[in-house]
């Protein structure tokens, strides 16, 4: 396999490390900044505050990558769709139901995404040159499912029923979001993002046929579109919960880096790393435990992936109740391991 050299700017034989939701509620310095802005989306669009919280975990832990502080739902919001975040509830959206809703979606864009690009530029100015900056977007199926459900975590009966019963409209919506997502990622790359990531949080609710149509196909289109303008930019895809369909995803989608959740067996990660860089997959709950358990679980991952195409991360985002000192311990442990075993492919 042709090596993707240094996707996270490590110019040595070391294991890149960063964490999903590394900028977030588990950090006291984040809470201090966040409490000054009541509305979450306003916070995401605040250039100075979003820049500050993006940089906080880099200053505290020295991760190999910063991920821009934003949200996957800024895209539909910027397209004029009604999106709000309720405390202790999560996202609440206008529910997409009809062709009239599609016409509305096509005709009410705003310039909110320009703030995201300003944040990327500002972070890039302040970020150490050895640290990568990751831009991201929600994958079309996940964004679409939020719009169809009108809220966050559900059983997805509404979304799945809609795509079964309204195939033409569902495909129109999917294609529209796919196009806008590709544009959003291209603009993030133009603004200075070194790496791009697609989060497909709800891909695991689909069967194989729908997974192909609503996850694989739009992801391929987005990657090919981005690569037209930025052929060398590494792209991470995270089809969370794909289980056995991860293998189909790897085979059919031209990704550089595959992020996997904690349900994926380590031996599968090792096998896949011969075809693609693999990122993952420590269970975030492990960081709620103690140092011995953290060390034990991290060691198993590191030993299995030793010498492979690998980025150390979690299987999902850092939980809000995570002790910051546990994140510090894990990061230092990975660094110590790599010092003793400096024969990684990176």
UniProtKB/Swiss-Prot annotation:
PROSITE patterns attached to this UniProt entry: UROD_1 (PS00906), UROD_2 (PS00907)
GO-annotated biological processes: protoporphyrinogen IX biosynthetic process
EC code: 4.1.1.37
GO molecular function, one term: uroporphyrinogen decarboxylase activity
Catalysed reactions, semicolon-separated: uroporphyrinogen III + 4 H(+) = coproporphyrinogen III + 4 CO2
Main location: cytoplasm
Compartment list: Cytoplasm
Pathways per UniProt: Porphyrin-containing compound metabolism; protoporphyrin-IX biosynthesis; coproporphyrinogen-III from 5-aminolevulinate: step 4/4
SUPFAM superfamilies in alphabetical order: UROD/MetE-like (SSF51726)
Record site: Transition state stabilizer: 71
Family stated for the protein in its record: Belongs to the uroporphyrinogen decarboxylase family.
Its biological purpose: Catalyzes the decarboxylation of four acetate groups of uroporphyrinogen-III to yield coproporphyrinogen-III.
Record text on subunit structure and interactions: Homodimer.
Record NCBIfam families: hemE (TIGR01464)
Name of this protein: Uroporphyrinogen decarboxylase
């Amino acid at each position: 396999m042709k090596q993707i050299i240094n996707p996270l700017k490590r110019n040595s034989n070391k294991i890149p490390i960063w964490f999903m939701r590394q900028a977030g509620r588990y950090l006291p310095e984040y809470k201090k900044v966040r409490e000054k802005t009541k509305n979450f989306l306003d916070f995401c669009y605040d250039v100075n505050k979003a820049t500050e919280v993006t940089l906080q975990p880099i200053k505290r832990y020295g991760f190999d990558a910063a991920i821009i502080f934003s949200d996957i739902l800024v895209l539909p919001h910027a397209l004029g769709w009604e999106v709000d975040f309720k405390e202790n509830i999560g996202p609440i959206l206008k529910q997409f139901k009809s062709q009239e809703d599609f016409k509305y979606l096509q005709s009410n864009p705003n310039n909110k995404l320009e703030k995201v690009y300003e944040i990327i530029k500002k972070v890039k100015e302040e970020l150490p040159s050895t640290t990568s900056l990751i831009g991201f977007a929600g994958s079309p199926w996940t964004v679409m499912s939020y719009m169809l459900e009108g809220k966050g975590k559900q059983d997805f009966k509404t979304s799945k029923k809609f795509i079964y019963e309204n195939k033409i409209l569902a495909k129109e919506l999917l294609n529209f979001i796919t196009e806008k997502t590709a544009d959003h990622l291209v603009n993030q790359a133009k603004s200075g993002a070194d790496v791009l990531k697609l989060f497909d949080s709800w891909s695991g609710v689909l069967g194989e046929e729908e997974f192909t149509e609503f996850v694989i196909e739009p992801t391929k289109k987005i990657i090919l579109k981005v690569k037209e303008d930025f052929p060398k930019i590494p792209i991470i895809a995270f089809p969370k919960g794909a289980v056995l369909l991860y293998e189909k995803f790897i085979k059919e989608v031209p990704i550089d880096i595959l992020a996997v959740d904690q349900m994926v067996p380590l031996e599968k990660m090792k096998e896949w790393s011969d075809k693609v860089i693999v990122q993952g997959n420590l269970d975030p709950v492990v960081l709620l435990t103690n140092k011995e358990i953290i060390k034990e679980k991290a060691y198993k991952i590191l030993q299995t992936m030793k010498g492979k195409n690998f980025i150390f991360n979690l299987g999902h985002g850092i939980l809000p109740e995570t002790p910051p000192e546990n994140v510090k311990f894990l990061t230092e442990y990975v660094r110590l391991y790599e010092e003793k075993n400096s024969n990684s492919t990176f």
